[in-house]
Amino acid sequence: MRPQQAPVSGKVFIQRDYSSGTRCQFQTKFPAELENRVDRQQFEETVRTLNNLYAEAEKLGGQSYLEGCLACLTAYTIFLCMETHYEKVLKKVSKYIQEQNEKIYAPQGLLLTDPIERGLRVIEITIYEDRGVSSGR
């Protein structure tokens, strides 16, 4: 059964981690609500990978500098014909989340929501009811 067909049992929100400043990174603390649903190491690896991808997106380098210069020279019309480094990495993040949902989370009755859909404030994990276990409600 696909999780989208089961009723929603709850949601877990993984908050941003501001301990290293305002760069986009999320807490790797394992939420108790996911106990017996997903392996702690897999969860932490998923969040660490997301944190690394967001760090890559925000990294300043030659490409970012060149994009900025081209943007100024073309009154930002260059972005009509090319993607920025940041946009490319955000696509990588979306693809990674989709893969993780298919391989790890969906079979466990969970669904990761792309943080960009929540304004990069939280990672939302939807928990679907397990039809095999009676909920007592």
UniProtKB/Swiss-Prot annotation:
GO terms under cellular component: Golgi membrane; Golgi stack; palmitoyltransferase complex
Pfam families: Erf4
GO BP term, example: protein targeting to membrane
Post-translational modification summary for this protein: Palmitoylated on Cys-69 and Cys-72; which is required for Golgi localization and interaction with GOLGA3.
InterPro entries (UniProt xref): Golgin_A_7/ERF4, Ras_palmitoyltransferase
Superkingdom, taxonomy of origin: Eukaryota
This protein's UniProt keywords: Golgi apparatus, Lipoprotein, Membrane, Palmitate
Main location per the UniProt record: Golgi
Lipid attachment, kind S-palmitoyl cysteine: 69, 72
Topology within the bilayer: Lipid-anchor
Subcellular location: Golgi apparatus membrane
Subunit relationships: Interacts with GOLGA3. Interacts with ZDHHC9.
Family (UniProt): Belongs to the ERF4 family.
PANTHER family linked to this entry: GOLGI AUTOANTIGEN, GOLGIN SUBFAMILY A, 7 (PTHR13254), GOLGIN SUBFAMILY A MEMBER 7 (PTHR13254:SF1)
Function statement: May be involved in protein transport from Golgi to cell surface. The ZDHHC9-GOLGA7 complex is a palmitoyltransferase specific for HRAS and NRAS.
Entry protein name: Golgin subfamily A member 7
Organism for this UniProt entry: Rattus norvegicus (Rat)
